[in-house]
């Protein structure tokens, strides 16, 4: 493991030098490729540096203990030695987790779909809350977020179903844990008796596919155009700019009406179709995965109940790992980092155990 880490650090230093080379800076395609490699190695190298620093400090303290005769100084050195030694297993475990091979789709952008489920108007309002939560999370991480489709429910402004494209660094690797059924428990504004209602919304996170990943034959597509309309039926477009594409072999139907031109809506609809087909392909490849890992990443499975948002108790519980937080308002405002880090750690640990079996 240490040889592998030393090689990674050497490569990281070489990349750092290359990224300051004017010739490489001038070649944007090559610069982006090298910069991604550099970013991918950064966390590993930083963890390795902490591990090496810890080992050196242990050696220094052991040397001090061998020479020290003063009882008080020796006791302090022993205390420091025990603290440093206690840190070693955690640092080693962190390195093992970071060295695990990444899923091939982790670095990709995503298409996210949110649909109101059981619960009528309350489910649509909750789907709107989730849409805003993910938009805020993307904003906090500096990602680009584009709304592809928004179908309004009976309640003005509430989301029946929506889809959006999120692009940035390692988006799928971070967002993939959000696929599944999200449940909400709260008292609706229209509830006069103060009773708590339960409703749900489903989320699907699909890795974005490039044209080279998925071959789509034009003959397999049926493209329909229709007039797009604003929320609540307002600002109905007189020109058929909205696009619906049906992929005959799979039966998948996608639509986009958020852009002003038919060409832009068609491009976005094709992006959604590629993502759905690529997700199916990945699901077929991953059938051999261990049950634990499949339960962590639903790959767009809308039937898996993953999380409950309880408003009366200001509680969020992720049922896959037993994670509970009482910071519900902050989470709904896009502060998902702690929750997602816990999910990532759980999945990485499961993969490590899988590898060691």
UniProtKB/Swiss-Prot annotation:
Disulfide bonds: none annotated. Methylated by PrmC. Methylation increases the termination efficiency of RF1. It is found in: Cytoplasm. SUPFAM superfamilies: Release factor. Its main location: cytoplasm. GO terms for molecular function: translation release factor activity, codon specific. InterPro entries: PCRF (IPR005139), Pep_chain_release_fac_I (IPR000352), Pep_chain_release_fac_I_sf (IPR045853), Prokaryotic/Mito_RF (IPR050057), RF-1 (IPR004373). Keywords: Cytoplasm, Methylation, Protein biosynthesis. The modification N5-methylglutamine is found at residue 234. GO terms for cellular component: cytoplasm. The keyword Protein biosynthesis applies. Peptide chain release factor 1 directs the termination of translation in response to the peptide chain termination codons UAG and UAA. Belongs to the prokaryotic/mitochondrial release factor family. This is Peptide chain release factor 1. It comes from Prosthecochloris aestuarii (strain DSM 271 / SK 413).
């Amino acid at each position: 493991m240490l040889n592998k880490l030393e090689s990674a650090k050497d490569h990281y230093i070489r990349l750092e030098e290359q990224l300051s080379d004017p010739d490489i800076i001038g070649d944007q395609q090559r610069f982006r490729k090298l910069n991604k490699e550099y970013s991918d190695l950064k966390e590993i190298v930083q963890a390795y540096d902490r591990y090496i620093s810890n080992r050196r400090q242990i050696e220094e303290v052991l040397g001090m203990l061998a020479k020290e005769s003063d009882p008080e100084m020796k006791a302090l050195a022993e205390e420091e030695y025990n603290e440093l030694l206690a840190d070693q297993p955690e640092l080693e475990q962190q390195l093992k987790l970071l060295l695990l091979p990444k899923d091939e789709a982790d670095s990709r952008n995503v298409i996210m779909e949110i649909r109101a489920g059981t619960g009528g108007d309350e489910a649509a309002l909750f789907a709107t809350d989730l849409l805003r939560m993910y938009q805020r999370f993307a904003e906090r991480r500096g990602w680009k977020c584009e709304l592809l489709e928004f179908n309004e429910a009976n309640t003005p402004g509430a989301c029946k179903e929506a889809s959006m494209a999120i692009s940035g660094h390692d988006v799928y690797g971070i967002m993939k844990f959000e696929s599944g059924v999200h449940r909400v428990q709260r008292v609706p504004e229209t509830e006069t008796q103060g009773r708590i209602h339960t409703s749900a919304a489903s989320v699907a996170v699909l890795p974005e596919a490039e044209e080279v990943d998925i071959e789509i034959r034009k003959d397999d597509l049926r493209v329909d155009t229709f007039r797009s309309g604003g929320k609540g039926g307002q600002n109905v477009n007189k020109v058929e700019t909205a696009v619906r594409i049906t992929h005959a072999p799979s039966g998948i139907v996608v639509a986009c009406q958020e852009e002003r031109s038919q060409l832009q809506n068609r491009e976005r609809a094709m992006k959604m179709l590629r993502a759905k087909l690529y997700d199916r392909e990945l699901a077929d490849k991953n059938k051999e995965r261990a049950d634990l890992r499949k339960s962590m990443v639903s790959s767009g499975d809308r039937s898996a109940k993953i999380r409950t948002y309880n408003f009366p108790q200001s509680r969020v519980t992720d049922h896959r790992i037993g994670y509970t937080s009482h910071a519900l308002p902050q989470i709904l405002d896009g502060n998902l980092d702690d929750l997602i880090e816990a999910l990532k750690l759980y999945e990485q640990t499961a993969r490590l155990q899988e590898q060691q079996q």
